[in-house]
């Protein structure tokens, strides 16, 4: 099959390429689905379950840690071929702590499959993933999985897709049977029934629609035609004449899908080998090729003017490094080629630092195995060796000076002090931290200048736990960890004036600078951490020292006076000042700015803010009381509770400070039957008693400074 693809001329090859992601809530079965796709496309020759008895683990979960936990942590890239098309698949993590992996893979994809559980339906992480897909305008089809499970109801899930995710969700199939009776699907375009029989569901039987499903199939077929005809005049006319063809229907659905105005819904059970091949057909029929997607870049020579890239191999090269891994053979850089051609031996330039690199080896990846290739063209996803770069860097062949727009990276909400148990491991610890921070922009590290301790920051407890475990396993570093720390912030609540004169005379040239003005709170909805406004007139502060004042202000933002955390939401306006011809300098105005800021900050009724997390708990209804109680004890504000089929879903907002250790509490109070997910929602003021406690603790720890 691969030779057939190689013979196409590039434009044809591009039309027959699909770059897709498979995204979902944790435990919706997406790694199992990927495993089946690889099996049916002959990329693997045996099926292994995620938590299988054979101990092999799914193909895409290549890290030992993933096989043990049964969750996917890193996006593994792989490719396969189906009906003369090349499909590049990025398998993305479903746990909310790893959303940067999802963000990063969606950035380089052309379309995606949103996997939903036929029982649980749209869950919190489905909403997060969907929001990420919207941010990057990713067209998608939905696959309602696990229809073999007790309580499965695909039509309820479609309603949730419409209500919760606001999708124009239209089924292109209906199931033949449900739960233990799931046998296959009815295709609402061809109006035929398909049964998946034989070992591993390889034997697909096409038959007439069963009598008991004809009425429902006809009704859903009409609904599908109505929805599809909105995107095709040709189909509308054909419907009036009573002559619509399968081709017309598919073309109309494809147009609506790529325009993000319709979401075709497929059904089945990956675990029971039902419906996967028809979903693959849907990927070819309805999802975008690289030609269908507009990719933009910023022109560095023209004020970062937005330009549109062309999926054309004859144009100058533009590609994006979207993932880094330390493999057995050195750093592996996953790259998406957006324009032009990338070949072995070529010189490429990193736009973030203008460094040039020679391309030594190009590979196509299959989870953690690789296949050498000589070149890659627009639309390809491949891996490079030995290129030193960071995730999100743009490479060109030097003919263009452009960069892809930077990816949205959320700020970390939790930190932890770490130290190596044995000093002989310090070198390995430094190596591990250097690698992980390069691979994952939401995993950050720094050394506290006062305590000398190494601090790691991330998106949640599990996120940091996984990195601690990886340091032990991959680098042999045993760590001593401190208690988790919440990323508090400080801000002001009222307007306050400042007027500070810095004067210092120590023989020779002195220092002089006066800074006056006011600071005021920036409303939270403006999502601006700091704003500097210059209203000085008449040269009270010379122009060259205005930046010095700004620098002085900025140096105060790193550490507030209440509990030593960063300051956000402050607008500083300078409107007066004074200078001295001889004694004024950049440093004098920086120092004046620093003291003026502190003066204003302490008068502006400062307060402490804490991260509030959106928490969603799913569990059996019999434990609803225990779940509500556990959230109330944690200063939780219940937003919504819904009950369906003996299951309850509770949505709440809870301060991160009170969520540590929650998974253990939830497990023990619900016999391990409930699960929760959380993500950052916003910053909010801490209650007075908590603020007093934090300030008292800060004073005790910093009494030496007073």
Curated annotation (Swiss-Prot):
Listed GO MF terms: GTP binding; GTPase activity; translation elongation factor activity
UniProt cross-references to SUPFAM superfamilies, sorted A to Z: EF-G C-terminal domain-like (SSF54980), P-loop containing nucleoside triphosphate hydrolases (SSF52540), Ribosomal protein S5 domain 2-like (SSF54211), Translation proteins (SSF50447)
Annotated positions binding GTP: 24-31, 91-95, 145-148
Organism: Leptospira borgpetersenii serovar Hardjo-bovis (strain L550)
Keyword Transferase included in the entry's annotation: no
Residue pairs linked by disulfide bridges in the UniProt entry: none
Family the UniProt entry places it in: Belongs to the TRAFAC class translation factor GTPase superfamily. Classic translation factor GTPase family. EF-G/EF-2 subfamily.
Domain of life the protein comes from: Bacteria
Protein name (database record): Elongation factor G
UniProt entry tagged with the keyword Cytoplasm: yes
Function of the protein: Catalyzes the GTP-dependent ribosomal translocation step during translation elongation. During this step, the ribosome changes from the pre-translocational (PRE) to the post-translocational (POST) state as the newly formed A-site-bound peptidyl-tRNA and P-site-bound deacylated tRNA move to the P and E sites, respectively. Catalyzes the coordinated movement of the two tRNA molecules, the mRNA and conformational changes in the ribosome.
């Amino acid at each position: 099959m691969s030779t057939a693809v190689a013979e196409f001329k590039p434009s044809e090859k591009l039309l027959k390429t699909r770059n897709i992601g498979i995204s979902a809530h944790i435990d919706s079965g997406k790694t199992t689905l990927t495993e089946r796709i690889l099996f049916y496309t002959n990329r693997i020759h045996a099926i292994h379950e995620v938590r299988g008895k054979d101990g092999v683990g799914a193909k895409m979960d290549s890290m030992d840690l993933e096989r043990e936990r049964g969750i996917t942590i890193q996006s593994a890239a792989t490719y396969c071929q189906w009906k003369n098309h090349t499909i590049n698949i990025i398998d993305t993590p479903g746990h909310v702590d790893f959303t940067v992996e999802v963000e990063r893979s969606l950035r380089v994809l052309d379309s995606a499959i949103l996997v939903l559980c036929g029982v649980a339906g749209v869950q919190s992480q489905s909403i997060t993933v969907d929001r990420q897909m919207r941010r990057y305008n990713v067209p998608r089809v939905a696959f309602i999985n696990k229809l073999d499970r007790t309580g499965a109801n695909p039509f309820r899930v479609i309603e949730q897709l419409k209500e919760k995710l606001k999708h124009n969700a239209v089924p292109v199939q209906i199931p033949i049977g449900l739960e233990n009776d799931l046998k296959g699907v009815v295709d609402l375009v061809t109006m035929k029934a398909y049964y998946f029989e034989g070992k591993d569901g390889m034997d697909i039987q096409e038959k007439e629609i069963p009598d008991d499903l004809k009425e429902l199939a006809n009704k859903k077929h009409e609904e599908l035609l109505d929805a599809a005809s909105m995107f095709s005049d040709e189909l509308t006319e054909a419907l009036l004449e009573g002559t619509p063809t399968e081709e017309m229907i598919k073309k109309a659905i494809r147009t609506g899908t790529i325009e993000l105005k319709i979401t075709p819904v497929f059904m089945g059970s990956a675990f029971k080998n039902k419906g996967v091949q028809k979903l693959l057909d849907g990927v070819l029929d309805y999802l975008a090729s690289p030609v269908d997607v507009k990719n933009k870049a910023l022109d560095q020579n023209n004020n970062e003017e937005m330009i549109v890239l062309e999926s054309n191999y004859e144009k100058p090269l533009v590609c994006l490094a979207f993932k880094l891994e330390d493999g057995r053979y050195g750093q592996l850089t996953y790259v998406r080629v957006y324009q032009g051609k990338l070949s072995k031996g070529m010189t490429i330039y990193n736009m973030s630092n203008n460094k040039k690199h020679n391309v030594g080896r190009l590979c196509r990846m299959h989870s953690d195995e690789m296949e050498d290739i000589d070149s890659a063209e627009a639309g390809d996803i491949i891996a490079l060796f030995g290129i030193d770069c960071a995730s999100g860097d743009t490479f060109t062949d030097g003919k263009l000076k452009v960069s892809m727009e930077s990816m949205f990276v959320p700020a970390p909400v939790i930190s932890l002090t770490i130290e190596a148990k044995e000093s002989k491991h310090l070198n390995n610890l430094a190596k591990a931290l250097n690698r992980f921070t390069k691979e994952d922009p939401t995993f950050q590290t720094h050394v506290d200048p006062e305590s000398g301790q190494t601090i790691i920051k991330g998106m949640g407890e599990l996120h940091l736990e996984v990195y601690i475990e990886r340091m032990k396993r991959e680098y042999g570093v045993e760590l001593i960890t401190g208690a988790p720390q919440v990323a508090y912030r400080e801000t002001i609540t009222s307007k306050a004036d400042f007027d500070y004169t810095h004067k210092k005379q120590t023989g020779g040239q002195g220092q002089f600078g006066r800074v006056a003005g006011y600071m005021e709170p920036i409303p939270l909805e403006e999502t601006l951490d700091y704003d500097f406004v210059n209203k000085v007139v008449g040269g009270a502060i010379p122009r060259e020292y205005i930046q010095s004042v700004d620098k002085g202000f900025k140096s105060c933002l790193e550490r507030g006076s209440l509990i030593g955390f960063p300051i956000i939401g402050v607008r500083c306006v300078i409107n007066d000042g004074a200078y001295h011809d001889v004694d004024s300098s950049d440093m004098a105005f920086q120092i004046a700015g620093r003291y003026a800021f502190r003066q204003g900050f302490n008068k502006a009724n400062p307060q402490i803010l804490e991260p509030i997390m959106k928490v969603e708990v799913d569990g059996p209804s019999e434990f609803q009381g225990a779940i509500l109680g556990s959230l109330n004890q944690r200063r939780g504000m219940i937003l919504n509770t819904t009950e369906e089929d003996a299951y309850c879903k509770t949505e709440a907002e809870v301060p991160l400070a009170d969520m540590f250790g929650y998974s253990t509490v939830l497990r023990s109070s619900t016999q391990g039957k409930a699960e929760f997910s959380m993500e950052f929602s916003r910053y909010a003021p801490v209650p007075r008693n908590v603020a007093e406690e934090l300030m008292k603790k800060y004073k005790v720890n910093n009494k030496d400074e007073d």
